[in-house]
């Protein structure tokens, strides 16, 4: 993207973060939710590759940097309240660190959370653990 929109006008939380939902651009499948700060959003818009902020590691998380499961960004949309982002991406491989295609594999059924999809790849293969 040649010129970035004004990212300061977005409504970040007290930690300076905004939720970002990644959706497969051609199927509409919701892949994951992660956090972005102004810098990671600027990088995403500039490079066309998803970059998030990892709250657990307290650092930038360039999707696919260790697993190879990159998200190429086709579009970034902002909701009407300016407090949530939607990234339309082309997911290469799996999106979830569990080896599943998306992170939403648990479904409320009969009073508990049931696993509805199996991993497509062993997480140890993804991260070399």
UniProtKB/Swiss-Prot annotation:
Binding of Zn(2+), residues: 80, 96, 103
UniProt-listed Enzyme Commission number(s): 3.5.4.19
Reactions mediated catalytically: 1-(5-phospho-beta-D-ribosyl)-5'-AMP + H2O = 1-(5-phospho-beta-D-ribosyl)-5-[(5-phospho-beta-D-ribosylamino)methylideneamino]imidazole-4-carboxamide
Localization in the cell: Cytoplasm
Cofactor: Mg(2+); Zn(2+)
Biological process per Gene Ontology, one example term: L-histidine biosynthetic process
Binding site for Mg(2+): 79, 81, 83
Any one GO CC term of the record: cytoplasm
GO molecular function list: magnesium ion binding; phosphoribosyl-AMP cyclohydrolase activity; zinc ion binding
Pathway(s) this gene product operates in, as recorded in its UniProt entry: Amino-acid biosynthesis; L-histidine biosynthesis; L-histidine from 5-phospho-alpha-D-ribose 1-diphosphate: step 3/9
InterPro entries documented for this protein: PRA-CH (IPR026660), PRib_AMP_CycHydrolase_dom (IPR002496), PRib_AMP_CycHydrolase_sf (IPR038019)
UniProt keyword annotations, A-Z: Amino-acid biosynthesis, Cytoplasm, Histidine biosynthesis, Hydrolase, Magnesium, Metal-binding, Zinc
Major location (coarse): cytoplasm
Function: Catalyzes the hydrolysis of the adenine ring of phosphoribosyl-AMP.
HAMAP family, sorted: HisI
Family membership: Belongs to the PRA-CH family.
Assembly: Homodimer.
Protein's recorded name: Phosphoribosyl-AMP cyclohydrolase
Designated gene of the protein: hisI
């Amino acid at each position: 993207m040649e010129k970035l929109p004004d990212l300061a006008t977005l409504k970040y939380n007290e930690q300076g973060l905004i939720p970002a939902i990644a959706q497969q651009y051609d199927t509409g499948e919701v892949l994951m939710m992660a956090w972005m700060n102004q810098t990671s959003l600027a990088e995403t818009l500039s490079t066309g590759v998803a970059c998030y902020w990892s709250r657990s590691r307290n650092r930038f998380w360039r999707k696919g940097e260790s697993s190879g499961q990159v998200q190429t960004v086709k579009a970034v949309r902002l909701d009407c309240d300016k407090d949530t982002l939607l990234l339309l991406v082309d997911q290469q491989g799996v999106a979830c660190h569990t080896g599943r295609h998306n992170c939403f594999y648990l479904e409320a059924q009969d009073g508990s959370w049931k696993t509805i999809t199996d991993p497509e790849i062993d997480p140890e293969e993804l991260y070399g653990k």
